Amino acid sequence: MESGGEGMNPVYEKLCACYESIRARIPFTPEIALVLGSGLGNYASKMEVVERIPYGDIAGFPVSTAPGHVGQFVFGYVEGAPIVAMQGRVHYYEGYDMTDVVLPIRLMKMMGAEILFLTNAAGGIRQGFSAGDLMLITGQIATFVP
């Protein structure tokens, strides 16, 4: 991944810069990317952890201001599967540009992840849902992502 060059997309250039700043610290090619939403940050303790990379160590990477968000990538294994997990993430409501909000997902793809699990705290009006239930997203509105 080379950054720079005439006419390169600035979003892609920033992505490449983030990747280059941590490439040597990535211990393996992750197959699975996991975003640990509110209340799930401790899931990383169930992993066989190999490396932790704080977001602040990544050149140009957005850092969360939300309370309780650790702000690091955790590389490790769960039942033999190589995983990169995000402990904390940035949110659009924190004032970040949407390109920064989605940058971590694009970075995990650049690391090699082919499977993505997104988790978050959510509310719903459907009767029968209880705290801790899993809900599957069947559609999304992606009008903000450039």
What spans do the regions from the language model cover?
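Short, Lys/Arg-enriched N-terminal segments with co-localized hydrophobic residues
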Residues: 1-7
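Metabolite-binding pocket within alpha/beta catalytic cores that recognizes anionic/polar moieties
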Residues: 7-146
